[in-house]
């Protein structure tokens, strides 16, 4: 059978319009996601702040109270110091007890019993967030005054006032002395409590002002010391570009910095936090790290590799002369299997007990002494000796095997299997001498020790016995795991010996003592999270790492996600976040990053919220200045348009984006209009009845069918019942209907958000009322609201036992069903094939990405590609890691006969891939989230691209796709101004969804 692609009416489209340049995780049970509470006698002070509505709080007023029992506790406070109020419901002397803690987590005392009796009810029922500041605290011996400020939702104001009145108290305005102290603080360099300036009297910044400040936040970083360039250690093969040398100098300066952290200064013998007025005798711990927020495609990975090899110890490189020592894996010698792997050898350092067997000569030009200076090793070595490279990986079918490693890295691979169950705890640091401190600052290992009955002293001693590790831990998404391996092989000289271990797969080595002696451990967020959730100690959490690097670090932006909690529990001397998008949705995205960097007092979410987030989002310019000062201290960001010495940071070829309008054929338009009219009538009824959100799955189903028709009528799914679950349905009928609805949502490509965490769905499950949530999120809701938990969207009763997952085999069935249908073309496929054939005629060597959210559509496109003689490859989320690597290698190959087309799913192509072999992108269907498109485009418009990049978006005229572009523009505007806009609450989110539905369906 032949296929003809002509300029006939079957592929009609209008003139192009240019609008700009520019793992396999095991299933977990319901109980897995139930919160495991330790220290039930203490309620964390930031518990109230975990609400999605935290930014809708208004100031109710202030009342004066007293802190008593000062002589019994070690915590001290200064004048005008902010303090945290924390409920202690299991206090044996007073069930209403409220602790007062200073910023460091040390207890100062308790709120006076009479006041606590009134306030405890308010805190327990989350009617208000109660915050404290001590106006005069420095010289008090027995009691001290305390101003308590109440913030809450407007609808709770009267309940709070009545509760206080019942106990003889009332709220008043914030004292002028407190307000004036704040206003004077910034002039004098001493900050007062950020909350004392009420939100309702603040001068609200306009949307344009906020947008401008957001745009400038990362781009206004003054060059000052950041223009200094530094050459990497001679172990680096690839010459660094000027902006990478600047980043290297800045990052090493940050790692070796002896400066005080932001907002700290020394006054006589004390160290003061100028924001909270807290002081300590001990010098605050330095922040050895930061955020490298360079734009996507500017070579952050190479910069990070240069830091690892250049700065091992106080400016000395990781490389030094090695002696005759045992191989770190000698104890597993009998279990060692050799196979081909990479072109880099293991390399050891004289400071560690690990070394290759026998004596290895040092690199030419390396001083004999291990105490050599950085400058002695900064020049590129003229002589190179080729020595085979060894990698250490776990053996497993899911691991990256020989065939999936880059060609440049084929060499000797030592594969170590481990059956031992030994554990060695790495050194850790107990931050404070109290259970409170352990609750908030201790590592997972410390808390588990404490839970097992060990005393705090024993816990501290046990965790401090480990030796200093040499290892850097790199955590990345699975999709870029192979890219890191490739980058090490490409950028590190072959004569350099590294102990490099990929911690991935079920047979991964779990011996923390052995892991700590490697140079580099590479793993994924999913593996880290999985280990963190296991009953035994996670080996990665048992080590105090030399350095932890988070690639695509914005992955931890959701503070409630298990993934974020797993990352925050890691112990390390130095910490780095690599991300091109540090703020994706709103200012709250930054807290997890700052918490990871261990920047006190922002480790505690309450202080972040009181000092930065709330002031900024309510338009307080002081809060904005604090945020800018903080960001400028710990962040380096350059965009593709940034300039160094008058020249662009990266001279990339131009990127052009075109919209190619498509006109549906008469048959396609008829089907489209029929489905639209039927769905429009049903949705109209939902609006009339006020049940549109209760039928949200049905609405998504309609939108999905319309989008599928725009691509190909074969994608059209079966119609769904517009009614919800019926009481007459049998359990099996109900299950089938719910699974069908869930499949529609999961296959819609909408990147649908969970209404609880407001993030993309992870471990999606569907309730009996047909709403889809993240499994961890909905399980926590059910647990906290037992026994009468209600759906967050429709308020119907829900139960953990009734949550349904979509079995992978059912999704596979749908795919098989599609492949059995007789193939035919569509208007979009005709337009694509015409463009590809025309492109091949002009230049047969040009490579293209064909991108779609629908993997079944990509399968349909394969047929005409084969018929027209195109050599192509494919990359989508259903492929195993080995297949992904092979596909990328084939596509990046420049030899004759290599694929000129890659069929790419939008999600698989959104993170970390380097596909700069392609210079043409054809986006077959628009995404709900425009950022997802931009990330995909940056896979080829990045460092290494030599040709002009042309992107073509296929959009069907007079269709839901055109309306999606309108919503995309709205989302772009919101993203640009998200820095200063208020975070949407649940009601705003619902209304936004309703408005989007009206726009999409033309209601």
Swiss-Prot record:
The modification Phosphoserine is found at residues 394-395, 397. It catalyses: S-ubiquitinyl-[E2 ubiquitin-conjugating enzyme]-L-cysteine + [acceptor protein]-L-lysine = [E2 ubiquitin-conjugating enzyme]-L-cysteine + N(6)-ubiquitinyl-[acceptor protein]-L-lysine. The modification Phosphothreonine is found at residue 730. The keyword Heme does not apply. Residues 831-990 form the Helicase C-terminal domain. Residues 317-373 are annotated as: Disordered. GO terms for biological process: chromatin organization; mRNA transcription by RNA polymerase II; positive regulation of transcription by RNA polymerase II; protein ubiquitination; regulation of neurogenesis. SMART domains: DEXDc, HELICc, HIRAN, RING. This is Helicase-like transcription factor.
């Amino acid at each position: 059978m032949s296929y003809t692609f002509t300029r006939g009416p079957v592929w009609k489209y209008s003139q192009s319009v240019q609008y700009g340049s520019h793992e396999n995780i095991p299933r977990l049970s319901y109980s897995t996601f139930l919160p495991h509470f330790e220290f039930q006698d203490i309620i964390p002070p930031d518990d109230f702040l975990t609400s999605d509505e935290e930014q809708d709080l208004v100031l109710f007023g202030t009342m004066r109270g007293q802190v008593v029992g000062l002589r019994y506790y070690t915590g001290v406070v200064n004048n005008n110091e902010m303090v945290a109020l924390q409920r202690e419901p299991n206090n044996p002397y007073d069930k209403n007890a409220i602790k007062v803690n200073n910023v460091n987590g040390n207890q100062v005392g308790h709120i006076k019993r009479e006041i606590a009796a009134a306030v405890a009810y308010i805190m327990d029922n989350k009617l208000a967030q109660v915050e404290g500041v001590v106006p005069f605290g420095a010289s008090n011996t027995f009691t001290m005054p305390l101003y308590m400020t109440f913030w809450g939702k407007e609808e709770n104001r009267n309940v709070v006032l009545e509760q206080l009145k019942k106990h003889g108290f009332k709220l008043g305005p914030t004292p002028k002395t407190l307000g004036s102290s704040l206003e004077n603080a910034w002039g004098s360099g001493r900050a007062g409590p950020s909350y004392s300036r009420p939100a309702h009297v603040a001068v609200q910044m306009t949307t344009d002002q906020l947008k401008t400040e957001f745009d400038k936040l990362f781009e206004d970083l003054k060059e000052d010391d950041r223009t200094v360039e530094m050459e990497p250690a001679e172990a680096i093969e690839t010459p660094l570009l000027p902006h990478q040398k600047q980043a290297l100098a800045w990052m090493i300066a940050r790692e070796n910095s002896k400066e005080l952290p932001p907002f700290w200064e020394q006054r006589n013998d004390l160290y003061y936090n100028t924001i909270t007025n807290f002081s300590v005798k001990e010098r605050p711990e330095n922040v050895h790290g930061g955020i490298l927020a360079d734009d996507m495609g500017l070579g952050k990975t190479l910069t990070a590799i240069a830091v690892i090899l250049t700065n091992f110890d106080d400016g000395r490189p990781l490389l030094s002369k090695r002696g005759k020592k045992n191989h770190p894996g000698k104890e597993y010698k009998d279990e060692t299997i050799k196979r081909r792997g990479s072109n880099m050898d293991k390399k050891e350092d004289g400071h560690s007990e690990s070394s290759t067997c026998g004596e290895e000569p040092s690199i030419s030009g390396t001083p004999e002494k291990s105490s050599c200076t950085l400058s002695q090793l900064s020049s590129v070595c003229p002589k190179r000796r080729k020595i085979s490279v060894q990698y250490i990986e776990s053996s497993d079918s899911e691991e990256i095997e020989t065939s999936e490693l880059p060609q440049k890295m084929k060499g000797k691979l030592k594969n170590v299997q481990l059956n031992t169950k030994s554990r060695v705890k790495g050194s850790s640091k107990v931050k404070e001498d109290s259970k409170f401190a352990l609750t908030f600052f201790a590592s997972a290992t410390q808390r588990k020790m404490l839970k097992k009955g060990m005393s705090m002293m024993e816990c501290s001693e046990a965790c401090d016995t480990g030796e200093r590790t040499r290892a850097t831990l790199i955590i990345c998404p699975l999709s870029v795991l192979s890219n890191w391996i490739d980058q090490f092989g490409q950028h590190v000289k072959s004569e350099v010996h590294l102990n490099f271990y990929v911690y991935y797969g079920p047979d991964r080595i779990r011996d923390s003592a052995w892991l700590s002696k490697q140079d580099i451990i590479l793993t994924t967020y999913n593996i880290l999270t999985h280990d963190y959730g296991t009953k035994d100690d996670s080996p990665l959490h048992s080590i105090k790492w030399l350095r932890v690097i988070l690639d695509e670090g914005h992955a931890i932006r959701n503070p409630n996600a298990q993934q974020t909690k797993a990352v925050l529990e890691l112990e390390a001397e130095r910490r780095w976040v690599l991300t091109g998008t540090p703020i994706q949705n709103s200012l709250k995205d930054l807290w997890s990053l700052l918490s990871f960097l261990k920047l006190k007092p922002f480790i505690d979410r309450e202080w972040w919220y009181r000092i930065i987030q709330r002031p900024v989002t309510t338009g307080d310019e002081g809060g904005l200045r604090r945020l800018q000062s903080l960001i400028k201290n710990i962040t380096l960001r350059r965009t593709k348009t940034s300039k160094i010495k008058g020249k662009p940071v990266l001279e990339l070829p131009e990127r052009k984006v075109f919209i190619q309008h498509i006109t549906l054929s008469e048959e396609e338009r008829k089907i489209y209009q029929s489905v639209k009219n039927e769905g429009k009538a049903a949705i109209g009824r939902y609006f009339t009845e006020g049940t549109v959100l209760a039928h949200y799955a049905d609405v998504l189903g309609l939108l999905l069918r319309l989008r599928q028709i725009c691509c190909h009528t074969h994608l059209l799914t079966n119609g769904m019942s517009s009614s919800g679950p019926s009481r007459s349905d049998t359990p099996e009928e109900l299950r089938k209907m719910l699974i069908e609805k869930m499949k529609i949502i999961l296959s819609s490509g909408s990147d649908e958000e969970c209404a609880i965490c407001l993030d993309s769905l992870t471990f999606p499950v569907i309730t009996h009322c047909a709403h889809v949530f993240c499994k961890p999120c909905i399980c926590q809701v059910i647990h906290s609201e037992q026994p009468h938990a209600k759906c967050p969207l429709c308020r119907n009763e829900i139960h953990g036992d009734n949550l349904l997952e979509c079995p992978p085999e059912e999704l596979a069935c749908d795919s098989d069903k599609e492949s059995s249908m007789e193939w035919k073309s569509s208007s979009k496929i005709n337009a694509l094939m015409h463009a590809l054939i025309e492109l091949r005629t002009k230049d047969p060597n040009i490579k293209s990405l064909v991108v779609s959210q629908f993997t079944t559509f990509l399968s349909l496109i394969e047929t005409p590609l084969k018929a027209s003689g195109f050599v192509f490859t494919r990359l989508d989320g259903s492929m195993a890691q080995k297949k992904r690597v092979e596909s990328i290698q084939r596509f990046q190959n420049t030899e004759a006969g290599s694929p000129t087309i890659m069929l790419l799913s939008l999600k698989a192509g959104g993170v970390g891939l380097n596909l700069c072999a392609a210079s043409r992108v054809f986006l077959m269907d628009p995404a709900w989230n425009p950022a997802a498109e931009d990330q995909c485009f940056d896979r080829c418009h990045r460092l290494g691209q030599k040709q002009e990049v042309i992107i073509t978006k296929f959009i069907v005229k007079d269709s839901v796709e055109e309306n999606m572009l309108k919503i995309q523009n709205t989302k772009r505007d919101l993203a640009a101004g998200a820095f200063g806009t208020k975070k949407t609450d649940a009601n705003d989110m619902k209304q936004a969804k309703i408005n989007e539905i009206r726009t999409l369906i033309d209601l």
